[in-house]
Amino acid sequence: MDSNVNWDQLVDALRDELQEKGGLIRLLNQQTETLYRRDIIENERLEEQIRTQLRLISRCTQGREFALRQAAAKLELNEDVQSHDVIRRFPEYVHPLLEALFSEVDRLSNRMEERLKQNQGLKERFIFETSSTV
């Protein structure tokens, strides 16, 4: 265990990613309501915000991956090492925090993917219903 490696950068990167993924889920919830109301203009506005949020998430994910690779390098581990291997090399008192943050990133990632698919299905249904009534 190497306590000289700063784990704050990794924690900050994980928190940033969580915040942005949470923001996307909020936007997707709004979009779901908008789709059920069949509010085309509001949906277009939300689509742009969702695209922007996805770009932010991508940058945050890259930042987290960079922080993990950087920590692995400082700990003299391979760059492609798994997060749990890096966590084990940090002081024991920080393990629960890092494990919880990584777990929450995974949970929100799965939820985000589910919501994106759900909303895509609603959009397709909405477009089909709109085109068949015209």
Residue map of PLM features:
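Short helix-adjacent coil turns
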Residues: 31, 35-42
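C-terminal-biased regions
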Residues: 1-30, 44-134
